[in-house]
């Protein structure tokens, strides 16, 4: 088959923001104006197309990243609508990994909020070009210019308005296009009767001021334009568009647009900007991966290149198990056999589909730059590479944060026992931040995730989708352990009891790893002191030993083990013996390497009336909080702090009583930090049953 849409006309974009900034409504309007849906869906009525899970429609929030394909101005736009709630950060993270551009939506009243900063950091991590849409210009208190300044100051972005609003709140009637220097006035409620006119006199001066900022910003990106500008010549609209496109794709400029998705204003102009300024797949750097020989290679966004694609999401639905893929290069065809190079397993592509929310459209192939889903892959999980079996490559996987909260779950009846394990397996396949383990002492099943809402939604899904009734315990903090010193340790496993014995011996250097690195293993064996076939079992033993630390039995993270020496026996050595030796080396080494307890720290942002600021700061300090910043805006005080999760249970109730119900707060995971000695002693004693 030939390509129906040239790759230069494809846009893979995400819509991301803080909760309640209006992302899903913006997506709905995009689908309406591009003709995918013929009736506008509303989040608050539970009719949004991209919110297809029952919980999403009930709660009015987006939980999973829904992928949808639409067309605009003879371009194919693949859109991912991502959640804004911090508990579902992994959904945003995996979307960023496979997108070429982002629309960051900001509320014109709330402005830059904590999750806005998280989304921005995630986009920075994957170097995703972006533009900003300042939404809800019709709301009381809307202030486009305040939010513009916040984007520049708090996000340190070179943000440049390419539009300014005409009026705000009830008086928001149109938009000035600063590139074309024309006004667009909305004459109806549907946003379809748009009148292009000269710029009204009351905003003419402001428009000239911001047009000058735009021209200066784009002129700086191109020597020829700089010269033209310095000589006093006028830049044409076409020259500005071309330079702005290159500057947006390179990440040096962030164009700012405005509108009101709910009131149907500004969406067509936003779609035009996606086509004009966000990149096609071949305009972003080619994806890099590792070949079997360890060398790095790239796969260009070209149908003729060998197939390379990344599984970025697993989803169970009535149609079966869907594996969402981004195809970076080559063609993925129905009926073909492919290689999961991450697991070194071959799989068959039985069916391929693209999504329009509830509608699944079967296709024969996905080409370079496409987003779609495969039905029925058995071994593929999130972050795995799917590639051509004759040209294997492993792409960089996804960054998955450690879970911060856990609860014990148990089936209510005997009939629920098998169903519970099946449900937990399916849900953990879908969501890499959802971990399932069994407490070795109590034999209870423990589930861990990114927050209370995250676990609440998953327990709810067990009941709805898998018909499992479960009792859920109290939330527990997901502590971790690590080491502070570099040491050498050995593990020697010898067993002689007549007949064939067991012999495995390894020597390792154990040292602290980089934050967020988990467990890292390196082999520096030379001369065959440990045969090649025993290195992998030794590594596996070490990994398994890291599942329970020596202080309080919490998982060991951010450690690096280097295999430097060892010995073997021609007859008695086996994979099992080296696996046990690896485990022994870690356990012995950790005791000597100054082990410490780590706890999850949360980034907390509290907004309260000015009068209550003293109470709030005092309360956060009493919770072992570190105050990181304060601000004042229109009678409301904002406090930014880092607080241990262990101290934040029940905070919502306490804060409401301290502020007479007038305060709001948001909380998201920041990082793991060492627990103070006196607190750690209590936690360790409790884990050992002394308290």
Curated annotation (Swiss-Prot):
Subcellular location: Cytoplasm
Signal peptide: none
Binding site for GTP: 17-24, 81-85, 135-138
Classification via CDD domains: EF-G, EFG_III, EFG_mtEFG1_IV, EFG_mtEFG_C, EFG_mtEFG_II
Domain (tr-type G) ranges: 8-282
UniProt keyword terms in alphabetical order: Cytoplasm, Elongation factor, GTP-binding, Nucleotide-binding, Protein biosynthesis
Pfam families xref list: EFG_C, EFG_III, EFG_IV, GTP_EFTU, GTP_EFTU_D2
Any one Gene Ontology molecular-function term assigned to this protein's record: GTPase activity
Predominant location: cytoplasm
Superkingdom of this protein's organism: Bacteria
Annotated InterPro entries: EFG_II, EFG_III, EFG_III/V, EFG_IV, EFG_V, EFG_V-like, EFTu-like_2, G_TR_CS
GO terms, biological process: ribosome disassembly
Gene3D superfamilies on file: 3.30.230.10, 3.30.70.240, Elongation Factor G (Translational Gtpase), domain 3, P-loop containing nucleotide triphosphate hydrolases, Translation factors
GO cellular-component term (any): cytoplasm
HAMAP family named in the record: EF_G_EF_2_B
Family: Belongs to the TRAFAC class translation factor GTPase superfamily. Classic translation factor GTPase family. EF-G/EF-2 subfamily.
Function: Catalyzes the GTP-dependent ribosomal translocation step during translation elongation. During this step, the ribosome changes from the pre-translocational (PRE) to the post-translocational (POST) state as the newly formed A-site-bound peptidyl-tRNA and P-site-bound deacylated tRNA move to the P and E sites, respectively. Catalyzes the coordinated movement of the two tRNA molecules, the mRNA and conformational changes in the ribosome.
Protein name: Elongation factor G 1
Source species: Trichodesmium erythraeum (strain IMS101)
Taxon lineage: Bacteria, Bacillati, Cyanobacteriota, Cyanophyceae, Oscillatoriophycideae
Gene: fusA1
